[in-house]
Every structure is written in C-alpha cells, then in structure tokens.
Amino acid sequence: MSSSAIQVAKTATYLPDLVEVQRASFKWFLDQGLIEELESFSPITDYTGKLELHFIGSEYRLKRPRHDVEEAKRRDATFASQMYVTCRLVNKETGEIKEQEVFIGELPLMTERGTFIINGAERVIVNQIVRSPGVYFKDEMDKNGRRTYNASVIPNRGAWLKFETDKNDLLHVRVDKTRKINAHVLMRAMGLSDNDVLDKLRHPEFYKKSIDAANDEGISSEDQALLELYKKLRPGEPPSVSGGQQLLQTRFFDPKRYDLGRVGRYKINKKLRLTIPDTVRTLTHEDVLSTLDYLINLELDVGGASLDDIDHLGNRRVRSVGELLQNQVRVGLNRLERIIKERMTVGETDSLTPAQLVNPKPLVAAIKEFFGSSQLSQFMDQTNPLAELTHKRRISALGPGGLTRERAGFAVRDIHPSHYGRLCPIETPEGPNAGLINSLATHARVNEYGFIETPFWKVEYGVVLKDGDPIYLSADREDEVRVAPGDVATEDDGRISADLIPVRYRQDFEKVPPEQVDYVALSPVQVISVATSLIPFLEHDDANRALMGSNMQRQAVPLLRPERALVGTGLETQVARDSGMVPISRVNGTVTYVDANAIVVQDEDGNDHTHFLQKYQRSNQDTCLNQRPIVRCGDPVIVGQVMADGSACEGGEIALGQNVLIAYMPWEGYNYEDALLVSERLVTDDLYTSVHIEKYEIEARQTKLGPEEITREIPNVAEESLGNLDEMGIIRVGAFVESGDILVGKVTPKGESDQPPEEKLLRAIFGEKARDVRDNSLRVPGTERGRVVDVRIYTREQGDELPPGANMVVRVYVAQRRKIQVGDKMAGRHGNKGIISRILPREDMPYLPDGTPVDIVLNPLGVPSRMNVGQVFELLMGWAASNLDCRVRIVPFDEMHGAEKSQQTVETFLKEAAKQPGKGWVYDPEDPGKLQLRDGRTGLPFDQPVAVGYSHFLKLVHLVDDKIHARSTGPYSLVTQQPLGGKAQQGGQRLGEMEVWALEAYGAAYTLQELLTVKSDDMQGRNEALNAIVKGKPIPRPGTPESFKVLMRELQSLGLDIAVYTDEGKEVDLMQDVNPRRSTPSRPTYESLGVADYDED
C-alpha cells in the first residue's frame, strides 16, 4: 500500500491536546490547590490559645522522586515525591518563634502521560461529574395536585438549606432534610427585623402570612426564634439561646463548616443577580433574602423567574484529579489538626518544635487510600492506545459524592441538549452504567469552574470569522445565543450559503437567516468522542451500533504487524500521539543513531538527546507494549515529530486491525447468527497474530516449620523436568514452556501431620527420616504455553520491599504468540461483531474474477435490521482505495457538501478505480458495488453478484484461549459442597433449573439424578463413585445432596421442626454417615503388616 492519503472532506480538524483534562488539573493542584488547603488550616491554636502553628503553604517544596517511572514500575513502588512545608510555631506568651521545614507526606506524581504509578501499577483518576453547588429552584406536585415550589441552597460542603411553599402560601425552611420550620423564624433567628425582610422583597404581601404565622406561634423576638430553631434541629436536648446562636453560626456562617466554594458563589451570584465578592464562601443574609424573593416571584409567576433543570450541563460540573486530590488532602489535614492540638496540650510548651507536632501519617494514609481504593482511581485500561486515551477522558457520575447505579433514574442517564459538543451522545457502556459513564467530546475542555466548554467560530453579518482562536462557550452561555451546526455549507470567503439556517436557541431548533446566526460549531466531529470519531461514515450507522463500534475499538488487541485503515477519518495521527504510546522528538535536529532500543537525536547546538524505546513490556491487560523506530540515521526531525511506532500504531497513526477482503454472502450456514467464516490466510500470513505476556509470581515465605526454599532439589521430580532450570531452580530466559512445566522450583518444610502413611511406615521400619519437605513449585497453568521473556528476582538484600513474611519473590514473564482461531471474537468499526466458526483453506474460499480469494465471509442479514449501513460504504470505499493504491480520509457528516454526498463520493472513486489499466471488472454499472464471485470448491459462479471490498477488521481481546475450560475433579464450595464456578476457580458448568426441566421433559431420570447428586454435592456418593470408577466396579446408588441438608438446617434455624422419616415413621438423621455399603475404611491400617504397636495418630 502506498501511504498517500487523500482527504475527501475538508474541515477544520485540528484538535486540542486530548489528555489536557488530566494534566492541567494536576498542575492546578500543585500550583494552587495544595497551597489553598495548607493555608486554610493555618493557624492551628491549642485549646488554651498559648501556641499557634502556621503552615506557610506557598513555601512548600517537592523533593526529586526516589525512583523514576520505569524503576517504580519494576520495583512495584509508587512514583511519588516527598512534600516538605515550612512551619512556624509561635508561643503567644513568650513571643518565641520557631521556624522549621517539616516533612508532611508523599504525593504520587502524574507521569507525562497523565497516569499515576501506584505500587508498580499504572492507574488513572477518572473525572467525576457532580451537581454544581449553588441555588436550585424546582416545582413539585403535592397530594392534591397543586403545584408547590422549593429552593435548595447546595454548598460544596456543609448543610443544605431548603425553602418551600405550601398550599396556604406559607414559606417554610428545612435544614439538612430535618423538620419544617417557618421561614420567618429563621429570619428572626438570623437577627433580621420584619422590615429588613419586607424591604428586600419585591412582593412583600405574600410574605406577610408567614410573619403572622410566626407571631401566632408566639415567636416574636430573636431569642424565641433561636430557642425554636434549637428545638427543631436538636430535638430532645434542653434548648438555650446561646446554643441556638452557636448552632446557626457553625451551620451556615463558619467557613470551616460551610463552604459554597468558588463555583457555588459564582452560580448564586449569577442566578440571583448579586455582586458578593467571590472570597465570601459562606452564606450571607443577602443570599437568603434574594432566594426568598426569587421563590415568591416563582410562586406568583412574575419577574422572569424560571425553574432549573438539574440535568443541564450548566448545573453539573466536572471534578478532575486536582480537585479530588485536594478534597482528600483536606480529609488528611483535618485528622492532622486534631493530632497537633492534642500534642500541643500534652507536650512541654518550651521544648516543642514544629517537627514534633506534625505527624505525616494521617495525610499519607488519606492520599494512599484515595489512590489505592477510591472508586475513581482505576487500573488503567491499556489494551491499546485508544483504550488508554479514552480512559483518561472518561467522565463518571458514580463515586463518592456522586450517584449510585441503583438510584440513578432515566433522566440522569439520558442525552441532554446541553451535551452538544461537551459529552459524547454515543460512547457509553452497555448495561447498568449506561449514561452514567460518559466520554468527553473531542474539542471539549473543562474551564476553571469545572464546567465543560466547547469551541465555536463567531459569525458576524452572516460571515464566519475563522481568523484567531475559536471562542469557548459553557452550556449556560450557549443557551442564550443562536448556534448553527458545524456542517453548515459556506462560500470561500466564509459567507454562509443557505438562505435559512437551522440553529439551536434555548434548547430548541429554529430556522433563521444567516444574519441572525451568532456562532457556528467548529467541526462536525466536535459533537462526538475520540473513539467514535474514528468511525468512518458514522452518520450512516444507527446510534446503538455506533456505540458498540466505539466500545469495541477499545478492545482491539495490538497485532504483530498492524496496518493503518484504508478508510479513516483523519484523526488517527492525533490519537496515537496523544495516547503517549509513540515517542516524540523533544528538539529540532538530526537523527545520529538508531537501533531497536534507542534513538539519538543531535540538536542544532550539537547536544545529543536519547529516546529509549519500550521493548516487549507487559501491559495492564497482558497485551504487549513494543516500540519500533520509523526514522533512519541522518533524517532531519522537528519538535513533536513521531519517531517510532508504539503497539497498534503504524507510521505514527493508530492501526487497530487489518484491512481484509470481505464478501457479504451466506456460506453453508457457517455465518449464521453473526458467525464469521475466515480464510486460512489470516492464520498462515500472521495477519491477526498478537503477542500476549503473562506474569507468574511465587514468593518464598517464612513458615512456622522454617523457611521455604527456592531450589533445584525438588523431591519426586524427574531430572528431565528440571532441564530448563538454572542452579537456583529458576527457569532460564528463552526457554519454551508447556502447561505443567516448572517455572520456579520451591520446597516447603512439612510437619509430622503432613506425612502420608507409607512414609510413616518406612520410618517405623528403617527409622530413617525421609527428607521432610514437599514440592510447592510454580508451574505453568493448564491452558497456557509460551516462551520465557523475563525473570525478576526480588530479595530484601537488594533493598526491595517485599510483602510481610516473604523472604524472596520471583516473577516470570511468559510471552505467547496467539494466532487467530475458531472461537475468537472479531469486529468491524460499525458494531458488526462475530465469532469465528470455521477457518477454510484459501482454495475453498469464494474468489474474485481475477482469482483473489476473499478473507472473510460475512452474513448479509447482519446489516438491514441493525441499520449500520456505514460498513457497506466503508467496504466499497476500501475497495476503490485498494485498487487506486491510496488511503482515504473521510470526516463524518459530509452532507454539507451536498445531499447523498457519501454515495456520490464512493461511486466516483469506484468509477475512477475501474479506469485503471486492467481493472475494468472492478466496477459493474449494472450492479454497482457488486461482483460476480465463484465458489472455490467447484469453480462455478454463485447465483447472485456479491458485495465485496476492503474493510478494517479488528481482533478483540475476548480470546477463546482465555475462556476455554474443562474440569474433571476440582475444588468445591465450602457450604453447599457444589463445584465452584468460573475458569479461575477450576469451576464446573452450572446446571440451572431450565436445564433440569429439559432433562425432565425427556424423562431422563437417572441422568438427572446423578447430575444433581454424585456429579455435584453428594459428598459421600461422589467419593464412592470415584472409587468405583477407578476400581472398575458398578457405581453405587446416590445419597443425599449436601445442599438439601443445608436447606433443612436453614429451615430448622427458623424454628420449623423439619426432618426426614422412613415409611415406618422413624426419623433419619441425614447428618450421620449411615452407609453400611462403605467398603473402604477411612484410613489404611497396618495391622496386617505386623506393626501392631505402630501409633496411628
């Protein structure tokens, strides 16, 4: 394939940095967030007020991390830096000041790629979308069907305040969902007189009823109001005026307990049209009065008051890494503050130093807990570069302070008009998380307040102004202007061509002349996410299938020789580059040295810059990370140029699969129900071969009976099994291992009780001690095989941190090449997925008029009902591109260039391809897009012409090798004594109630009985059955299943007298072994050997 790419649809597709969400947020945390937190806790005074400890936050510093990123991964360490902050201890009595730099904990640092290395594993902190603090006005229907209104003031942290109206036009207030209190009681408690309130309201007459109601209750003074407030908020405690005062003060006016946050203040000011400075983060009297006023206007339906939509993106904000981390640091500092106060009280005042007061543990614990076990700190999805990039751009509504799956209704999950250009309407998981986990749209960015913005070009007098930077609008701003979509057709000078343009205005569509348009979207791609924007002809696919296509691209396994898509969208380069998988030149200069491990670039000043490449590293998902240089010695490079391909990249573009020749036709039923029929060429030419690296680990522990040993001396193992082990008993790198082979030899000391009777016999006869260790080696599991690519040994002597009780840890990495096989899952980019049902020799595959056999035969019935016609466009465009020997870039939504543009483009290309010499058969005007195929087995033509072409097909990570599993005997569950489930537990297959019905319907009573007893949980019966099979005797009758006994015990525990009786009415105790047929005694005895004095313990 020549690599000339033709851009079919020209639009502005320059994208912002795609990982900026993560990096910018962490940078904010280092520059501001951390300092803010440290300074908000300072000063800390002791209970007597004699000592003060100040944190000088702006003077914090970070030390160089102990390990670099690679080293941290290798040693299972955390890539973190030590934080030091200057503390000042002031003694108020003596005026003495002690200043000292104090260690306050370790802070994990973000790598260049926007990830964190925690205990050697790469993790991503997912962005969370939560309800923004501020004031919200809602309406509710009461029992009589009358509409009432309420207003909630939601802070960043602290108590909620909710005002509501009732059917008698009275105003009430609730604090944190407690009982209702008359609103005027709260006003009086806050020290406001009747006139103070009435002067602020535009419709005071409505409020007077509430004043009268308060007076009727006998609450006419501030003191009485405070008493009433205390009674309602703290029922059961003796009320006092001072208590009420303190309660009110701490709940709403103390910055430590109540914080609106910068965002909350901004939103309240905006909604209520206030001008309170954004440094005032607590409630003010003005906030409360304006909220009341707005609520009354709503009730009376005057003054332009409007309700809020809580699913609008103007009312939801994104909390990224920096803010989540800041909240966690606050938790740690809260704990630290308590400790410092205690130490101040206990210690000797004169000799105290800041270092003695500050204990780094609580802060370290809080940060560790966040990175290690928070719902938002996730193990990075590293299947391929796209998966990695998407994971960093993911936005979740779950997590602490967010929603839960069970509680989230339909409205929260639904697509909202304000998502346009901010959240992708397509990419979201299928299943219980649908709509709760979203992906950021391609051009979206998060502003300083955490609201998502998207860019537009300004339009003046019908002309789109594309000079300068685009203008970013948040969802609130966008509602107030008229916005045209990105695929509006324009003349060369930027003038909008059409007479009437569809625009969005206040979440509705209307048609206006070009002069009234305020903004135009930047690009048609800006609505969708990165993964979705890689799907060509997206506009011809049904949304459900596009969703599957987006999700399945993230599951594509990096192949041995990746190939760029013939038909792409032009965003492939940027995805590869921003994912961090491809090394990029840091300077302008010339390549002076290249090999598989490093690239050296000499800059203009003659300095060398070495870029080391990753070779065959294991990713989080066991796929292989490998980089291959694409520059040569002497090549000039510029800053930002891609110098090597990562996994699933080719030529600096993302390449998730292969372009294969596909025909849509049924073939002997082998592609029934989405199955795929594939050619042997995919196997022999290694088209879909991938490398997987599996990690096996064993530790030698200290046991009660002595240490375990890693050794070559393993009891009862033949010498040939040890052939590949070195003198320590560890497999050598490069050895090929099959299942059951020893990777690391290990012996464990065993006590007396572990010894089998024959050993005891030998010791009784000869009095000698057999070597009392047992083989506990690490072996290759059942279905695995491969080549050992790396062995790592960790010991305490080398300074490695080991788990408690371990003396040595050995890790073995085994790589395997997996060719494609029956049972593997494959998919296209349009949600067309299937399982391989048969691999056919290429001479039997249907072949083209020029003799080329096709690679994959798909079922044509997979297209019409699923409505993902994009695959057919891609197929034919790929066919044309392959015959023209070029690659095509098609930006989605091309109708701006004319109606039915996709069809015209494809047809033009096909006609162009047919003009090539000797290629006339490529396009048949009678049957456009179809060719006459012949059957490879008979050579006869098929009845109908068939759609044939090149499509980009992926091999997904659901490989049959990892799924296939069989069990003969294995572990059982402790309670029910039934076999466990799943491959990892060596489990059995579940025989559910429907399977039981099927056997009952056949009347297969004996088969059914043994499935439910000896093959499952009749403990005694299964042991006897095994014994009988081994000895070749008839299998005895089954007994009682263990789960039946468990059921009886459960009913008995409820106090029901339930038991099993014989015909004669005699009770049978199922818990006893009542089996006279037990021919084998429980243990062998050695009386017959004449060792009568042998002590059988």
Curated annotation (Swiss-Prot):
Record flagged with keyword Hydrolase: no
Print the keywords alphabetically. Answer: DNA-directed RNA polymerase, Nucleotidyltransferase, Transcription, Transferase
Record keyword Signal present = no
Task: Provide the disulphide bond pattern.
Answer: none
Reaction(s) the record says it catalyses: RNA(n) + a ribonucleoside 5'-triphosphate = RNA(n+1) + diphosphate
The EC class name is transferase
Q: Which Pfam families match?
A: RNA_pol_Rpb2_1, RNA_pol_Rpb2_2, RNA_pol_Rpb2_3, RNA_pol_Rpb2_45, RNA_pol_Rpb2_6, RNA_pol_Rpb2_7
Family designation: Belongs to the RNA polymerase beta chain family.
What PANTHER family would the database entry show?
A: DNA-DIRECTED RNA POLYMERASE I SUBUNIT 2
Q: What NCBIfam families has UniProt attached to this entry?
A: PRK00405.1, rpoB
The protein, known as: DNA-directed RNA polymerase subunit beta
Q: According to the entry, what is the taxonomic lineage of the organism?
A: Bacteria, Bacillati, Cyanobacteriota, Cyanophyceae, Synechococcales
What gene does this protein come from? rpoB
